[in-house]
Each structure stands twice: as C-alpha cells, then as structure tokens.
C-alpha cells in the first residue's frame, strides 16, 4: 500500500525527461535481434514489461548487454534463435506475448509461453486466429489464454489479411510472420494504428510499404544492426499533462517526448478540451520527438469516437479523470478494446473514480462522464487492480482531493509495469520551483 499526496495547490512545475517509449522499446529488441550485426539502443525503457522482452530474447540465445538505460544487441538474423528448452516467461507483458506469437511462428522449434496470473487471464485468440489462418500453429488452453505453445513452421506462406479490429499488436505479430513467408504479404488495417514497427524495420533495411490502410511486407529482408535513440514515452507523459492541466499554478516541460502521428491523439483530445499545451518539435527523424509544455487550464467536455480510440487507447484512463473534472458531458465510444487490457478498464476506471465522487455511466464500449467541480474523499482505499495505468491515474486524482486525510492506494507496485520511477518524478514536479507558472 502507498499513501498518496493530496491537496496540491502549488501545482506541478519543472522540466522532466520521460523514460523511453515502451512500445518502441519492445520492438527495438525484437528488430535488433533479427538483424545481423551490432545494434545500440539508447534510452531503453526499464519498465517491468520491457524487461520481460529483454529476458525472453536472452533465453532465445541473443547476446544483449545492458548499460544503464542503454543496450547493445548482437543480432544474428531471423533464423539464429536457439530453442530455449524451457517456457519463456512473459511476466505481465501482453505486447511481448502477442508479438512473439508472430515472430516464433516461423521458427524451426516449438516454444511455450507462460505469464503471470493477470496475463494468463487475457485472451490470445485475437492473435493466434489470424496467424493460424496464414499458416501458423499453436497449442492453446480451452479458453485461449496462456500457457500457449507455438508450433514452429519455418516455411510460412504469404498471405493477404484484413484485420477485423484496430490493433497495433495484432498487426505487428502479422508483420513478424510476414517477414518469414515465401512471398510478399499484404495486411489491411481497419483503422490506422501505431506504426513503430514499420518505421523501425524499414530503418534496419526491410521493405515495407504503407498505402493508406494497406501494408505490403516483402519477405526475408537483409536487416543490418544500427543505433536507435528511443524518445520519451508519450503514454507516460499523459499523466503529467493531465495533472498539470487540472492543478492550478502548474507549468511543466516534458522533454524529448515521442511525437509519432499515430500516438499524439492525447494531445489533440486535450487541446479540444481547452488544455493549454504547446508542442515544440525538436527532431525530424523517422520517430520524431519534441518538448511538450503544459500550463494549468479549465477543461471542457468533448466526444471521443471510435476513429480516435486506436490513438488514445492507453491514455483513456487518465482522459477519463480529465473528463470527470471538465465542464459538461464527455462521451467515449468505440473503446471495446479496453476489455482485453490488464483489467476490464472501462469497469475498473469507472468504479475507482466513483469512489472519489466522479459521475460516470458505464457503457458496453465506453463511458458517459458528467464533469463535477471537485473530487471527494474516498471512504475506502483506492486500488490499482494490478493495472499500472489505473494506478498512475489514481495518484494524479488524489492530488486533486482537498483533504488533509490520508488516501491509500492498494498494490502500487503495479505501476512498475510501465513506469518504475513514476512517484519519484511526480514528487520532483510537485517540489520543483524552477518553472513556476
């Protein structure tokens, strides 16, 4: 348990470097491992999830050396993995699991994937079904959850596949399978999703062409190791962006944050809500990054529709908090994807914020939120439910409760899944006078 800070009238102030983007960190190890030669990865995320990816590839025989936030990966190509001879532990990482289902489908050995209790409740059919359709094979439990054994087939066939849902993880798994096919493959997206893997693979020498929602993957590319600098994680930045918007007297600068167009939906939505946000782009690399400056503001309600959901899917918990204190009624729809996160996030976010007096109506694919002037003191402890993003959202929410009483958060350790130093960085911004607004 952790006692949360409350009643913060001085706001957040200062500059902060965010940890490396979690989505890019996962993919950087995978791409570096299937390339030939040495890759240097700078600002790798130290989140528990990304360390699960690191450990999985060590178990697959890849030589990786870690120096603080940087990695050196000695890649040997797509066909150089070694049979681990034991189950690969995915921890709590759905990204590691789903992407490995695609990558290992084309190997010459079988691999069993296991995970913790939370991950072992999450369905994997949404990945195994499409990969099975294109030639992969899996041995699953009756309900499609971990443990799963990937039956390796080193002769995968090319495919054309229409994704039934907007999911970057399913798309990425299919791309990894397509790299091991005998001919070019085509993937059709339902909605555009984060494209970090496509950008990175092309940077390493792959031939992947995107035309609207159509992605063509050429097989068996000659990938060469290179250096990657991972920008700050915008999904982690979102918690500070909302906190600074809601807390009076705030002025923060979040430095070198990733500004990939498929990830900046959080900025667009907050600006529509009347947030005072300025973005200063400082890099024009394939994965652009820049500084995000946020001042306090009075937020207004908005509507968030299914077309926006893929680009704010990880930020919906903290956006729900923002909507709970915004003027008017916010409607979120088309967010059924939240059913397959660490928790059923729609229900859990609504339940936890209702403890604080938020006015939320739960819908099958979203929420209706009526803004209230202030949050209340909860009668019971707040709980992360093992979900890192809910934990960080509740830590921000506690700052907005006008009380000298203690608010306690159960299972704060879950936050380490994506942001081990979250509370340290939050304390820094709460106690830093160098940019008083």
Curated annotation (Swiss-Prot):
Catalytic reaction(s) noted: 3-phosphoshikimate + phosphoenolpyruvate = 5-O-(1-carboxyvinyl)-3-phosphoshikimate + phosphate
Gene: aroA
Record: residues binding 3-phosphoshikimate: 22-23, 27, 167, 169, 314, 341
EC numbers: 2.5.1.19
Gene Ontology BP annotations: amino acid biosynthetic process; aromatic amino acid family biosynthetic process; chorismate biosynthetic process
Role, per record: Catalyzes the transfer of the enolpyruvyl moiety of phosphoenolpyruvate (PEP) to the 5-hydroxyl of shikimate-3-phosphate (S3P) to produce enolpyruvyl shikimate-3-phosphate and inorganic phosphate.
One term under GO cellular component: cytoplasm
Pathway the protein acts in: Metabolic intermediate biosynthesis; chorismate biosynthesis; chorismate from D-erythrose 4-phosphate and phosphoenolpyruvate: step 6/7
Subunit structure: Monomer.
GO-annotated molecular function: 3-phosphoshikimate 1-carboxyvinyltransferase activity
Subcellular location, principal: cytoplasm
Subcellular location: Cytoplasm
Record family assignment: Belongs to the EPSP synthase family.
UniProt entry tagged with the keyword Transferase: yes
Source organism, top-level taxon: Bacteria
EC category: transferase
Active site: 314 (proton acceptor)
Binding residues annotated for phosphoenolpyruvate, in chain numbering: 22, 94, 122, 169, 345, 389
A Pfam entry, by short name: EPSP_synthase
HAMAP family, per database record: EPSP_synth
The entry's keywords: Amino-acid biosynthesis, Aromatic amino acid biosynthesis, Cytoplasm, Transferase
InterPro entries membership: Enolpyruvate_Tfrase_dom, Enolpyruvate_Tfrase_sf, EPSP_synthase, EPSP_synthase_CS, RNA3'P_cycl/enolpyr_Trfase_a/b
Name the record gives this protein: 3-phosphoshikimate 1-carboxyvinyltransferase
